[in-house]
């Protein structure tokens, strides 16, 4: 399916930030993509283009890089505010709303869907509203934000969860724990990729990062195909 691709600025509380829009012709759904710590959806563009080719308009905000591996309440809430601006402007009641995120981006999607996230210092983060996502595709999400009792009790949506066995940022044991928690609320499609690390799900790796995948091209093509099938099913 044809789609157009543009990058433009929008405003949140009189502050401008950038979004990339991949607008599908006669879109079946709207996908909100949330990048990880680095904040750039450009590193995931081949994946997002495949999703758009399957008939979904993709909205991908750009964020400033988080300076620390342990982000603060203020830093995460700033991202959530930008995401809520995007959701208000681009989600429509007549279109299916889907979230797709990597790492801390996947964590923020769970918070937007009703998860009660706590930072490492014990401060709560979260949106002004709970957003009704029909599906969430979560790639190597940061899990520690949701390990307190009842944290994900109000998340009620179909989940696609994928993690790498060689991930040292989000270890497989944490991903399996998240799967067990989410299964209490609904259906979870879980894939544990044997050779994948935390950054294997990025089409463009961060500087000085080497991937554990022996054949990145084949892996990324399969990843994009699987996610596109999930969001359009």
Predicted regions and their residues:
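Primarily recognizes the serine-hydrolase "nucleophile elbow" in alpha/beta-hydrolase
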Residues: 86-152
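C-terminal catalytic histidine-bearing segment of alpha/beta-hydrolase fold enzymes
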Residues: 187-233
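The feature captures the conserved acid-bearing segment of alpha/beta-hydrolase catalytic domains
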Residues: 124-187
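Conserved beta-strand scaffold positions in the cores of enzyme catalytic domains, especially
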Residues: 5-7, 58-60, 136, 189-192
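Serine-hydrolase catalytic machinery in alpha/beta-hydrolase-like enzymes
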Residues: 6-98, 200-213
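Short, well-ordered alpha-helices that flank and scaffold nucleotide-derived cofactor binding pockets
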Residues: 49, 53, 114-118, 180
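Short aromatic-enriched loop/helix-cap "lid" or pocket-rim segments at secondary-structure transitions
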Residues: 72, 111, 149-151, 173-174, ...
């Amino acid at each position: 399916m044809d789609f157009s691709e543009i990058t433009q600025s929008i405003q949140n509380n009189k502050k401008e930030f950038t979004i990339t829009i991949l607008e599908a012709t006669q879109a079946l759904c709207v996908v909100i993509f949330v990048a990880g710590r680095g904040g750039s959806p450009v590193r995931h563009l081949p994946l997002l283009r495949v999703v758009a080719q399957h008939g979904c308009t993709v909205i991908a905000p750009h964020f400033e890089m988080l300076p620390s591996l342990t982000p603060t309440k203020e830093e995460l809430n700033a991202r959530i505010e930008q995401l809520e601006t995007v959701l208000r402007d681009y989600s429509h009641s007549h279109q299916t709303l889907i979230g797709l995120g990597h790492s801390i981006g996947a964590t923020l999607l769970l918070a937007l869907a009703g998860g009660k996230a706590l930072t490492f210092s014990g401060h709560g983060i979260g949106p002004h509203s709970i957003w009704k996502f029909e599906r969430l595709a979560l790639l190597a999400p940061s899990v520690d934000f949701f390990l307190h009792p009842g944290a994900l009790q109000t998340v009620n949506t179909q989940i696609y969860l994928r993690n790498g066995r060689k991930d040292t940022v989000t270890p497989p044991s944490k991903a399996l724990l998240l799967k067990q928690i989410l299964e209490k609320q609904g259906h979870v499609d879980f894939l544990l990729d044997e050779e994948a690390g935390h950054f294997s799900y990025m089409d463009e790796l961060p500087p000085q990062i080497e991937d554990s995948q022996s054949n990145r091209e084949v892996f990324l093509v399969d990843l994009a195909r699987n996610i596109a099938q999930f969001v359009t099913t």
